[in-house]
């Protein structure tokens, strides 16, 4: 929320007014010389201070901005217990004493660990020194009463002892007290300084006058539970958590408070948030009652006070804690003191409650869309539903209107609509562009484990997802799902019932031709899937699979005859697993049944009678899966370096499978395909993905896995190799084509993962054909020299496979995220197809980050995944981020998270 730090500062200012009432209960005064009271100034309508006065307040506030880049903001200038000590004490109380395992292995040092250790900011806001007299007075008070001194760490401020000191003091033992000359008041983590503090309960007036300074450290506002949560999250807290915990410093000329009405007024207030590293001022602050606040001439920025690159200025701000809303009037956003945009009125939240109003605008620049400005408006329609309406303004397109509607019901679930409309797009031959996405989720309140979901997706054209950063979908998708689904599970059954259709976008098939109706997926109208197990036999595992559906695909372009109908598939299996620490053996028997029936339209189109349109087939299957485990302690590199320790595990495996041949050439294929080859697939019961074919498979598969795990539990090497050998040729085909499995073996398959250094990972997988030519190989090398840098290099080469519709590809992939110094970094990623001599996707950019703001400029050139023959899209994008405002997620970070392996932890380290 934009002005929540302002609201937090007001709360702290009022501590100075509200906390003064406790002076009537306890006060420790250095000198008790009696003195006559001076007239008390209570008029809150004095002439506003001039600009020099507010500048004086800012100068006083700047005393707490320390120019030491290595300073810990939570502990600077503190002589008492700090945040780290508090977290350590809590962590020690929560965690049992353990023996630390030293780190083993080493890091690869090809690049410097850090390029530039200079801080991003020239300084930071720090708390003032703790008053040493406070703890001393607390200790002495406890000793005089024969009681131990209270532990102030974690003690709520309203329960902590109050201590006051000054040069002069007066108290009439009834209802009047006055302190003057270097007045200091401490209670817990709250601290006030002033030239004079007066309390007159008879007139209901309290006042702090002359160079008022107040602070409330965040550690004092965090409860024990909050602090414990912070420790368990490695000390990281969200922006909202930080704002709620306080951690503020404020200075003012004076503060007046009416103890009867609750009205208070302060002038020339300057404040800083240590937790948020933000600061600002208000020329005048007035609190007419306990729930309303009025500020005049307000400024807020997260930049250093010595170099304020941006700031928000408002003529006035009104806050209401009852409604949870604030109103800003005549607000101007400035960059380098130059006005950038102006809002005459702005309504915003000051707590977690929702309310209607404008949200923070977004802006970006690209060569395709030009300048894009998004202005969202939020509608708080009811506690259980709301809406957001956004206007997108482009310099190269007509404006787009998009909306989001969210709802939550007590018994019928929750959902969200997203839609957009752009009329007469100048960049798309004047066509209208539109989209609609809907998602609904439901869980039964009366039947446990019963849930449901619904999904709808629609776009106007195949390029829509490519042109716009769409809510609901981030990548190009050929088939957009539309479905309604029910799910249920318990200890014995896991089932789903769904109806599903698709919107298929215009695209090219594998032959470079436009997709035809025959290439589109079947609709399921409906489909019922059940996975179940029967608890009849104690030592046997009896399981079953049932898949029943009506498949429909309309053929309107004459690309083939329509083949729609019903399919019923059932499989019942019984196994007797025998397992031990040294190995296992799992024999299994299965019986499969497949029944299909064409519908009336398909019978006519294919000139079939009803009997020919019905097909039924039974196929039994038997298999034995066995493996051994050989364990040996120590490192395989012990002859060279035995410091890694750990153990090695060698696991050979052998599986035998037999299922006979049954002719299935007259059975339609609704949604079945042949699986791609990989290590795990070699040990499955079938090569068909789907239930339109029951494979005849007579084969045995030997394989072996070797793993090395070091002393800290890190898997340094995990490698597997296997090959499937066929005793009989396979005769079942998908679509009356030649048999697929007629060779002697599948070819050799391997899969390895290695971590030779603590910051280097290497993955290699591949397969050979049965003649031991290359089928495919993929490699991925990841090097992370530091927490905020990353380098990836990958290679993939695969041959054409007509059985799986695998296209040939020879491509290199590379990505890099590395800092130039502590403020600048380079971002790059690319995918190059050297068979086509074509860069399929490339991005390069620079990113800047400091304590005040950040920006990125990057260029991207890429092809539409749905039509690689089209010309590539080229875009130059720019984005600006303001520290402390917005979610921190941008189009660039979302794109890189999808394209760059391991980007998200690197991004978190860079932001921290």
Swiss-Prot record:
UniProt signal peptide: 1-27
GO CC annotations on file: cell outer membrane; transporter complex
Iron is among the record's keywords: no
InterPro entries: LipoPS_assembly_LptD, LptD, LptD_C
UniProt keyword list: Cell outer membrane, Membrane, Signal
Pfam families reported in the protein's UniProt record: LptD (PF04453)
GO BP term (any one): lipopolysaccharide transport
Localization of this protein: Cell outer membrane
Quaternary data: Component of the lipopolysaccharide transport and assembly complex. Interacts with LptE and LptA.
HAMAP family: LPS_assembly_LptD
Family, per entry: Belongs to the LptD family.
Function: Together with LptE, is involved in the assembly of lipopolysaccharide (LPS) at the surface of the outer membrane.
PANTHER family: LPS-ASSEMBLY PROTEIN, LPS-ASSEMBLY PROTEIN LPTD
Protein name from the UniProt record: LPS-assembly protein LptD
């Amino acid at each position: 929320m934009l002005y929540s730090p302002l609201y937090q500062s007001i709360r702290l200012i009022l501590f100075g007014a509200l906390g003064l009432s406790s002076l009537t209960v306890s006060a420790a005064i250095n000198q008790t010389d009696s003195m006559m009271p001076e007239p008390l100034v209570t008029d809150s309508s004095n002439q506003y201070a001039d600009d020099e006065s507010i500048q004086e307040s800012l100068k006083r506030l700047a005393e707490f901005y320390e120019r030491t880049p290595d300073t810990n903001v939570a502990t600077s200038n503190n002589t008492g217990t700090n945040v780290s000590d508090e977290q350590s004490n809590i962590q020690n109380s929560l965690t049992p004493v353990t023996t630390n395992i030293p780190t083993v292995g080493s890091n690869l040092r090809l690049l410097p660990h850090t390029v530039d250790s200079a801080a991003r900011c020239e300084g930071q806001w720090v708390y003032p020194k703790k008053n040493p007299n406070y703890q001393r007075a607390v200790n002495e008070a406890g000793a005089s009463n024969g009681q131990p001194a209270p532990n102030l760490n974690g003690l709520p401020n309203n329960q902590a002892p109050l201590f006051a000191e000054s040069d002069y003091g007066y108290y009439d033992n009834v209802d009047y007290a006055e302190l003057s000359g270097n007045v200091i008041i401490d209670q817990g983590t709250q601290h006030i300084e002033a030239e004079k503090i007066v309390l007159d309960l008879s007139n209901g007036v309290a006042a702090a006058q002359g160079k008022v300074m107040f602070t409330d450290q965040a550690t004092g506002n965090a409860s024990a539970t909050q602090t414990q949560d912070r420790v368990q999250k490695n000390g990281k807290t969200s922006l909202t958590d930080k704002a709620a915990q306080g951690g503020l410093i404020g200075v003012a000329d004076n503060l007046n408070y009416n103890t009867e009405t609750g009205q208070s007024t302060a002038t020339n207030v300057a404040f800083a948030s240590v937790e948020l590293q933000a600061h600002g001022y208000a020329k005048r602050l007035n609190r007419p009652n306990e729930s309303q606040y009025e500020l005049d001439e307000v400024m807020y920025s997260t930049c250093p006070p010595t170099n304020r690159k941006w700031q928000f200025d408002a003529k006035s701000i009104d806050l209401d804690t009852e409604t949870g809303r604030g109103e800003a009037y005549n607000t101007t956003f400035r960059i380098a003191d130059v006005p950038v945009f102006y809002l005459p009125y702005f309504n915003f939240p000051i707590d977690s409650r929702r309310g209607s109003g404008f949200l923070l605008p977004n802006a970006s620049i690209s060569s395709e869309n030009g300048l894009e400005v998004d202005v969202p408006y939020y509608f708080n329609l009811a506690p259980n539903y709301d809406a957001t309406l956004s206007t997108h303004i482009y310099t190269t397109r007509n404006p787009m209107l998009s909306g989001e509607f969210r709802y939550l019901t007590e018994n019928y679930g929750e959902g969200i609509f997203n839609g957009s409309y752009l009329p007469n797009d100048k960049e798309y031959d004047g066509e209208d562009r539109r989209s609609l996405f809907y998602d609904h989720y439901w869980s039964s309140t009366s039947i446990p484990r019963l849930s449901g979901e619904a999904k709808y997706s629609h776009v106007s054209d195949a390029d829509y997802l490519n042109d716009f950063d769409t809510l609901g979908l981030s990548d190009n998708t050929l088939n957009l799902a539309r479905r309604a689904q029910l799910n249920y599970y318990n200890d014995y059954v896991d089932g789903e019932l769904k109806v599903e259709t698709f919107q298929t976008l215009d695209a090219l098939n594998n032959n470079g031709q436009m997709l035809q109706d025959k290439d589109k997926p079947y609709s399921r109208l409906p489909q019922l899937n059940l996975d179940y197990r029967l608890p009849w036999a104690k030592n046997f595992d009896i399981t079953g699979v049932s898949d029943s559906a009506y498949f429909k695909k309309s053929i309107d372009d004459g690309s083939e005859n329509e083949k729609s109908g019903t399919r019923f598939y059932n499989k019942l299996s019984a196994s007797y697993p025998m397992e031990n620490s040294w190995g296992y053996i799992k024999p299994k028997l299965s019986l499969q049944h497949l029944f299909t029936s064409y519908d009336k339209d398909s019978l006519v189109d294919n000139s079939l009678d009803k009997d020919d349109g019905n097909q039924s087939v039974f196929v039994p299957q038997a298999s034995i899966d066995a493996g051994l485990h050989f364990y040996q302690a120590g490192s395989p590199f012990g002859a060279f370096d035995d410091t890694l320790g750990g153990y090695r595990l060698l696991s050979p495996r052998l599986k035998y499978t037999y299922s006979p041949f049954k002719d299935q050439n007259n059975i339609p294929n609704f949604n079945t395909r042949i699986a791609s080859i990989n290590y795990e697939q070699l040990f499955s019961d079938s090569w068909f993905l789907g239930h339109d074919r029951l494979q005849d498979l007579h084969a045995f598969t030997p394989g072996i896995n070797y793993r090395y795990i070091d002393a800290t539990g890190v898997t340094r090497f995990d490698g597997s190799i296997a090959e499937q050998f066929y005793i009989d040729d396979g005769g079942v085909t998908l679509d009356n084509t030649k048999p697929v499995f007629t060779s002697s073996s599948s070819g050799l398959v391997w899969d390895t993962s290695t971590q030779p250094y603590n910051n280097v990972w290497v993955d290699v997988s591949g397969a050979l054909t049965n003649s031991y030519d290359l089928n495919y190989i993929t490699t991925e090398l990841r090097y992370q020299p530091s927490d905020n840098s990353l380098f990836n290099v990958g290679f993939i080469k695969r041959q054409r496979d007509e059985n799986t519709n695998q296209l040939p590809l020879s491509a290199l992939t590379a990505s890099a995220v590395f800092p130039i110094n502590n403020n600048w970094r380079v971002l790059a990623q690319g995918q190059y197809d050297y068979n086509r001599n074509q860069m399929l996707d490339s991005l390069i950019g620079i990113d800047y980050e400091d304590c005040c703001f950040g920006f990125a400029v990057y260029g991207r050139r890429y092809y539409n995944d749905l039509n690689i023959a089209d010309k590539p899209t080229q875009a130059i994008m720019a984005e600006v981020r303001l520290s402390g405002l917005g979610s921190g997620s941008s189009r660039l970070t979302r794109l890189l998270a999808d394209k760059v392996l391991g980007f998200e932890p690197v991004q978190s380290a860079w932001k921290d």
